[in-house]
């Protein structure tokens, strides 16, 4: 019986059977070696006198140890197993029982043999194919004199090309030829006697027979023969091929299953934007298609394929990276990046916790190694300029130098994002890093583009705030934010404005306040719980039971009231509140302090009566009051020039006629409140800026000077209060360079401070006071239009000699303040006395002045050359000083009512009202 027939028949086993056998036995033994202690693994068939062990380490290939009675043979690796073993070593000693079994089986086979040797009793489905294999093998065996297990399986391999005869995993005729040791050719002779069978064949048939009986098979199948050969470590090259192939398949499956584990460091310090896009957790990206296409084009390069997004804060640099992740998730990208994954690396998280030198470098190297092994990662670095200084210390290198080699070779695909200033400050200084990034400029969105972006985000914000946005509200958010929020950029500021308007409307329409009945029940429940605990502590369980029942009843009542209120609110919840254009205007008014909401009826009446309100504090000067009122009305109704301040006025006139007082009255009445007029007015005394070096204090000191970085006194105040009155008092005393600085403010409504920030003056009312020509006004004073025209021409000529033409040409109006008449001074005296009476009333003293005393004050305080300031000094001397002496002497106490009068000598007389003569 030629044993090659057995091998040829054994190779007939189909692939699934071999895969099952390998998985149950060899794979488990070999691949489990590196993961656990050496373990004895049972062969897939019941093998006698044979065990299989595996030993392995983390870095070396697992090894097999075959045990055959007293012989121990170590197989160091999978490759070339058959070359290190000989048949003599691999053949176990045949027991007497095995010999008898073999002789019986061989006799049966010989009795059924035909002219050409064949084994007809194979398992159905394989017998015919095995018979053909034996016939093919006979031709090969005729060249050999000894029948063993090392003859090539040529007969079987000729049948492998058909579908029903698929080869064993990885087994080809070439491999078999290479793995089989050649036997020298002998004269053509086919051994038929049993003596010519080798001991390997005898033992293999015996084991196959035993296994067939063990599993209740009536015949010996090819599966039994093959597993018998492998279990006896005969035909070891078949086991080598099967295990190598299965090991590769298993490693591939493990690699796929542990792909996420291999990105452990990257996932610890990063965020998978592609996964978030697949889950729908990213906001939709509207527009920016041109910039995204440019990024994809750079990513498709072979080397230096690293785009760097450069733009101002808030223009949408991060949104472009998220948009790319969304396109990859939906597959709407070229095939060059279809399988890529966008991961955002958090540099702050990467740097956190690096206590010792080298920890940051180790994290970065692990990240780069994971990216290199994966090969499908696009790394997004927001604020990429932090790479330049991250980790830099004495004796260490920064993160940028670690990234540079990978960026240049194309091993790392990175999308950076930074601002224009940071790019110039950090990236451009490092020429080696700059050449590895390809800049992509991200401009600020236009108003129309911003409206489209807001419409794309509308659904997300409606779901969050439970409101509805009208198209007019979105347009207003884009336009108003672009117009009134100057220190930020679109679309970020428009999105924030839309978000804030939604939150305002939601809170305004919220009906979550509990009713009074619910509050009373909750208070009673709290009291009941306390009494129950006290009863339990003193072991009064009867009382505790009663309180517990009362507690349950209270909870039921509270729940019923709450559910009823929820049901009543359900119809309102369906009809969600609507965010309108006026809601957006209210939101930006809260944000900037500029009144942009529509003019209400109350405010309309307030604007129409603005002159009357101002005249309560400012006596006379009708022209100035009217000019200021007209400017306020234009600005409030949106009719003023959008690129200039509300108004730029010069109040010219003699001292003490109410120039500064008018600005204060305007700030108190319209821009602020009467209690705090200073909060709505930016006042600068220009006498403090007489020196040339003091001019820089208006906008901030330049680098290298004291107070650099503190902000300018003018620019910083307007940045904090953009809707205010800017009063430049006694402007003619300032240095001439101050007027050059104000040219840009008067014409364009903007000014750049010492830190490079642009300050918006478009919502300010600029008032400058001057005393130029005051002596001429006093000397040429008089009544009538002729005198007023003569004074105006005189003052205008004087101002032309003092100020430059470009400064005067940018002023809206120069208003002349006339000297005060005695009648106007009397009215001012009444205002001052009423103001003093209000201060004394806070001390508990009721004050009343007579007409005689008022005339005395006007007589001593009137001076046409000095205006109303002498009047204030007269009030202080005649009234305040006299009343203070009486209070110190005890003649006037808290709660008294006093009357102030004047005697015939022109002195003030203070007496209590109950001491007055009848």
Swiss-Prot record:
PROSITE patterns: CLPAB_1, CLPAB_2. One of its GO terms (molecular function) is ATP hydrolysis activity. Pfam families: AAA, AAA_2, AAA_lid_9, ClpB_D2-small. Residues 266-515 are annotated as: I. The keyword Cell membrane does not apply. It is found in: Plastid, Chloroplast. InterPro entries: AAA+_ATPase (IPR003593), ATPase_AAA_core (IPR003959), Clp_ATPase_C (IPR019489), ClpA/B (IPR001270), ClpA/B_CS1 (IPR018368), ClpA/B_CS2 (IPR028299), ClpA/ClpB_AAA_lid (IPR041546), ClpA_ClpB (IPR050130). Its main location: plastid. Belongs to the ClpA/ClpB family. ClpC subfamily. Molecular chaperone that may interact with a ClpP-like protease involved in degradation of denatured proteins in the chloroplast. The gene is CPLC4. It comes from the Eukaryota. ATP binds at residues 311-318, 653-660. Disulfide bonds: none annotated. The keyword Transcription does not apply. SUPFAM superfamilies: P-loop containing nucleoside triphosphate hydrolases. This is Chaperone protein ClpC4, chloroplastic. Keywords: ATP-binding, Chaperone, Chloroplast, Nucleotide-binding, Plastid, Repeat, Transit peptide. Transmembrane segments: none annotated.
């Amino acid at each position: 019986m030629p044993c090659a027939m057995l091998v040829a028949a054994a190779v007939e086993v189909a692939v699934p059977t071999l895969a099952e056998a390998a998985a149950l036995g060899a794979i488990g033994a070999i691949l489990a070696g590196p993961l656990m202690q050496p373990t004895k693994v049972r062969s897939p068939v019941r093998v006698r006198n044979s065990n299989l062990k595996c030993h392995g380490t983390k870095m070396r290939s697992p090894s097999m140890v075959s045990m055959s009675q007293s012989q121990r043979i170590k197989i160091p690796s999978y490759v070339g197993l058959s070359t290190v073993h000989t048949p003599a070593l691999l053949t176990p000693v045949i027991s007497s029982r095995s010999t008898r079994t073999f002789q019986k089986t061989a006799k049966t086979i010989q009795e059924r043999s035909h002219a050409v040797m064949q084994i007809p009793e194979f398992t159905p489905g394989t017998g015919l194919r095995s018979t053909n294999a034996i016939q093919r093998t006979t031709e090969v065996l005729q060249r050999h004199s000894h029948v063993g297990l090392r003859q090539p399986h040529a007969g079987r391999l000729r049948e492998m090309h058909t579908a029903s005869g698929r080869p064993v995993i990885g087994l080809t005729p070439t491999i078999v030829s290479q793995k089989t040791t050649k036997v020298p050719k002998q004269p053509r002779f086919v051994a038929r006697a049993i003596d010519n069978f080798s001991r390997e064949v005898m033992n293999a048939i015996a084991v196959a027979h035993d296994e067939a009986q063990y599993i209740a098979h009536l015949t010996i199948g090819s599966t039994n023969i093959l597993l018998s050969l492998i279990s006896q470590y005969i035909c070891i090259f078949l086991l080598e091929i099967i295990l190598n192939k299965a090991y590769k398949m298993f490693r591939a499956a493990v690699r796929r299953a542990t792909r996420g584990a291999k990105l452990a460091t990257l996932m610890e310090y990063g965020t998978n934007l592609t996964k978030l896009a697949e889950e729908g957790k990213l906001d939709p990206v509207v527009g920016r298609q041109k910039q995204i296409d440019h990024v994809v084009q750079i990513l498709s390069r072979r080397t230096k394929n690293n785009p760097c997004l450069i733009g101002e804060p808030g223009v949408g640099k991060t949104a472009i990276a998220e948009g790319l992740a969304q396109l990859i998730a939906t597959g709407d990208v070229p095939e060059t990046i279809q399988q890529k994954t966008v991961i955002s690396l958090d540099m702050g998280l990467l740097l956190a916790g690096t206590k010792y030198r080298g920890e940051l470098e180790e994290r970065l190297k692990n990240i780069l190694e994971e990216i290199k092994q994966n090969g499908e990662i696009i790394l997004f670095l927001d604020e990429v300029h932090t790479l330049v200084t991250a980790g830099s210390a004495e004796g260490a290198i920064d993160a940028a130098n670690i990234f540079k080699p990978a960026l240049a070779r194309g091993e790392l695909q990175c999308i950076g994002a930074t601002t224009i200033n940071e790019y110039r400050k950090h990236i451009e200084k490092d020429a080696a890093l700059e050449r590895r990034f390809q800049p992509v400029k991200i401009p600020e969105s236009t108003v129309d583009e911003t409206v489209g972006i807001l419409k794309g985000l509308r659904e997300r914000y409606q779901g969050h705030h439970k409101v509805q946005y009208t198209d007019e509200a979105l347009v207003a958010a884009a336009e108003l934010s672009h117009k009134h929020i100057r220190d930020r950029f679109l679309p970020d500021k428009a999105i924030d404005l839309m978000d804030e308007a939604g939150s305002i409307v939601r809170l305004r329409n919220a009906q979550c306040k509990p009713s009074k009945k619910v509050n009373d029940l909750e208070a009673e429940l709290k009291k009941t719980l306390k009494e129950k605990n006290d009863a339990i502590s003193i072991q009064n369980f009867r009382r505790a039971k009663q309180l517990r029942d009362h507690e349950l009843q209270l909870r039921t009542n509270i729940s019923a009231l709450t559910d009823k209120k929820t049901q009543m609110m359900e119809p309102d919840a369906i009809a969600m509140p609507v965010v309108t254009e006026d809601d957006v205007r209210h939101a930006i008014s809260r944000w900037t302090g500029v009144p942009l909401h529509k003019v209400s009826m109350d405010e309309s009446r307030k604007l129409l009566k603005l002159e009357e309100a101002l005249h309560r504090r400012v006596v006379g000067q009708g022209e100035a009051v009217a000019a200021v009122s007209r400017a306020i009305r234009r600005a409030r109704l949106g009719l003023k020039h959008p690129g200039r301040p509300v108004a730029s006025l010069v109040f010219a006139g003699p001292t003490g006629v109410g120039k500064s007082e008018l600005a204060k009255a305007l700030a108190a009445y319209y821009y602020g409140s009467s209690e705090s007029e200073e909060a709505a007015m930016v006042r600068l005394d220009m006498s403090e800026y007489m020196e040339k070096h003091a001019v820089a204090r208006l906008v901030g000191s330049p680098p290298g000077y004291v107070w650099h970085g503190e902000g300018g006194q003018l620019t910083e105040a307007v940045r904090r209060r953009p809707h205010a009155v800017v009063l430049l008092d006694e402007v003619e005393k300032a240095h001439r360079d101050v007027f050059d600085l104000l040219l840009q403010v008067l014409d364009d409504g903007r000014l750049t401070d010492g830190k490079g920030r642009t300050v918006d003056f478009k919502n300010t009312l600029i008032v400058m006071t001057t005393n130029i020509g005051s002596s001429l006004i006093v000397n040429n004073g008089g009544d009538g239009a002729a005198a007023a025209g003569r004074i105006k021409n005189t003052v205008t000529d004087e101002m032309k000699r003092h100020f430059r033409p470009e400064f005067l040409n940018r002023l809206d109006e120069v208003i002349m303040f006339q000297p005060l008449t005695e009648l106007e001074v009397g009215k001012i005296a009444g205002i001052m006395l009423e103001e003093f009476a209000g201060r004394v009333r806070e001390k508990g003293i009721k004050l009343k002045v007579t007409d005689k005393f008022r005339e005395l004050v006007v007589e001593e305080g009137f001076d046409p050359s000095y205006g109303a300031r002498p009047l204030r000094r007269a009030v202080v001397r005649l009234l305040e000083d006299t009343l203070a002496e009486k209070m110190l002497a005890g003649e006037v106490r808290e709660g008294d009512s006093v009357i102030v009068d004047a005697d015939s000598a022109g002195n003030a007389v203070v007496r209590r009202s109950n001491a007055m003569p009848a």
